[in-house]
């Protein structure tokens, strides 16, 4: 008999607790909800990076990026970096960065071959930028030569 009474009280208490947990979800302002929806609606979906050796003195960097939503442009910028043993950090190598820009596209594939020294340690720094509805999103990623 005690078991039935405790179930009779426990079930309404659990339902009440569930209802209390959902109240804060409805308390968000419509403005913050609209901003969150916009940021979620237009975002970088996929960024794939490879940096592979090609012979002894070349490295091939390949980047694929895609974004969803209302995309005005997508841009990839690749910067070669080399390890500086005196500072223990990677620094930008002498020479330019290489970029590709695609207006009104939601994806972009870009590849570039870098000249390398056999006696240095390299990686690439990749900046991927997408823009839409006046909001710009940039991700910076790194890939070591492998």
How does the language model describe each region?
Residues 78, 89-104:
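Solvent-exposed serine/threonine-rich low-complexity stretches and specific carbohydrate-binding patches
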Residues 2-11:
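Bacterial N-terminal signal peptides that target proteins for export
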Residues 41-80:
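Short, surface-exposed binding/anchoring microloops in extracellular/periplasmic proteins
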Residues 12-21:
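Bacterial N-terminal signal peptides
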Residues 20-37:
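Sec-dependent signal peptide cleavage junction
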Residues 134-146:
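Short beta-strand elements
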Residues 97-125:
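Short, solvent-exposed, Trp/other aromatic-anchored flexible loops in extracytoplasmic proteins
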Residues 77-89, 125:
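Short beta-strand segments and strand-loop junctions that repeat across beta-rich extracellular domains
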